[in-house]
């Protein structure tokens, strides 16, 4: 199809529904595996749908980042590393680093100095499909070719620490990256609701950034309108600025690696250690 046959909201419903169905239905799960394999091998109909998924997703990401005044020089997806995967896998085999284990291809990365178990890094499934580690390694190959970085810094969910430890070790063991090149993992925690669990909507779904910004702006707007000293339009425009401060300061004022509770009521307060209070204080200084 020329136009995307779905919206970002529909995609957000399809993905968890398909994930849940694959856990309960083995036949469906196998069909999903086969579809993934065909997609990775370039099957045109699946690639066309995938292109629409990418376009819709990236457009939504760019819109949300624009709301936060955040820009990126490059927008690179996991699939950008795909052309490098075949040669990289062959290189791992030729160097004797990758070997078969239960039909899959793995690279041993454990070291004598390890204080905990580091499992082998799985780089190809038994059906020939690629995994996250495969793409991450191929991405490093691409970055070495294009940028030759002095160091790598990965800012990712802290729960991915083991994964990237494996990837970094394979990259250095295979000579993709020089042994003395720093490869740093900076893990961050999750933003949780008052119940201590990852933020969700009132309906129980995953909280989208766009929805979170809307709720924060509305909370700030209601606080501004309590004094009834400004027009509704002024209150809305002010709420957008103050709401952004509440979100950014609420997030950045916590230790990056720790999970924390994002309490909208507290973080939108004009009192205490909050973004709105800092803006309020700044406005008084300039009076």
Placement of each model-derived feature along the sequence:
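NTP-dependent nucleotidyl-transfer catalytic core
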Residues: 1-285
